[in-house]
Amino acid sequence: MQKLENSVPFGREMKDAYFNFAKNYTPLNHGSFGTFPKSVRDYQRDLQDLAEARPDTFLRYTYPDLLEKSRCAVAPLLSVSMDEVVFVPNATTGVNTVLRNLVYQKGDVIIHFSTIYGACEKTIDSLCETEHIERVCVHIDYPEEDEDIISKFINTVEDLKNDGKTVKLAMFDTVLTFPGARFPWEAMVETCKTQQILSLIDGAHGVGHVDLTHLGRVSPDFFTSNCYKWLFCQGVDKN
């Protein structure tokens, strides 16, 4: 794999030396599709060649070993055990996997914030059509203080309880898609524990972007992320 030389300055020189962008292309929207260095591209192609050389051997024996090594590599970034790490196609798939495998009862509510990613909101809407579940949106309008966000959430929970509802789960982000602000997810997890509410974190812009080495200690019920955005992994099929 290509070795990163300290002599290459950060910025345009590094982009041209280590990434696959066209010379006249300046990427301003890394968050949507991500990218990966040339060294990752080269290793990916080596694996493709290995798989094509001995398909049966690769899928039965080589792939499971590589998968376990990849899980072992990600686990320390989150300070969790390898047994808690599972790969999914993307964060939205992870959200769907969690939400569609919970058991709901009449009166259950899912709380989310107005900054929720669109696909996740549509998933909740879909559930509301097929399950005994309601969704409640907590409106926030940035700039907003973290303490005010937590206070709005608690007030919403109390209002729902007084109305005879049960808040089953709260869904929130690590870093918001719009605006690109860091969400107080640690405080939200702690609040959910106090309120006996399941916490689901959409960390699509989490791993590789912000420090998550305390995730194991914070211990949300569910956390899902994307490695292809900020961890420089190959993931999104742009074809």
Explain the meaning of each model-derived region.
Residues M1-N239:
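Pyridoxal 5′-phosphate
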